[in-house]
Curated annotation (Swiss-Prot):
GO terms for biological process: translation. The keyword tRNA processing does not apply. Coiled coil: none annotated. The gene is rplS. Belongs to the bacterial ribosomal protein bL19 family. This is Large ribosomal subunit protein bL19. InterPro entries: Ribosomal_bL19, Ribosomal_bL19_CS, Ribosomal_bL19_sf, Translation_prot_SH3-like_sf. It comes from Maricaulis maris (strain MCS10) (Caulobacter maris). Keywords: Ribonucleoprotein, Ribosomal protein. GO terms for molecular function: structural constituent of ribosome.
Length: 132
């Protein structure tokens, strides 16, 4: 392991603290709890939608979540190691064959649905990929 990878691992551990990041991919329906500061007040806002992409790697990794709000498509890009993201919940696993689901931007209604990946035991537990 080179020096940069080691520094990135240490920084990721420092930023995460007690939080854990679930293993999710494109097609999964997520609930992202985001900390929002409005003046003196601070609150948690939940953004629920389909993960349509994961980008980057290391500390710079991010993911895009899309939802339909009042008939309009809304997308937010969250850094994976953001201190403003309080928690990430996986609501359901999606069965898709693509890593990037940008084609969902052009779809509405039933054609934008994603089938659920079923294992027979609820949300499937995957081991994180090992590099090397």
């Amino acid at each position: 392991m080179n020096m940069i990878e080691q520094l990135e691992q240490e920084e990721a551990a420092r930023v995460l603290g007690e939080k854990t990041i679930p293993d999710f991919s494109a097609g999964d329906t997520l609930r992202v709890h985001v900390r929002i500061k409005e003046g003196e007040r601070e609150r948690i806002q939940v953004f629920e939608g389909v993960c349509i992409a994961r980008n980057g790697g290391g500390l710079n990794e991010s993911y895009t979540v899309r939802k339909i709000s009042f008939g309009e498509g809304v997308e937010r890009v969250f850094p994976l190691y953001s201190p403003n993201v309080e928690q990430i919940e996986i609501k359901r696993k999606g069965k898709v064959r693509r890593a990037k689901l940008y084609y969902l931007r052009d779809r509405r209604g039933k054609s934008a649905r994603i089938a659920e990946r079923v294992t027979g035991r609820g949300i499937e537990k995957r081991e994180p990929k090992k590099k090397g």
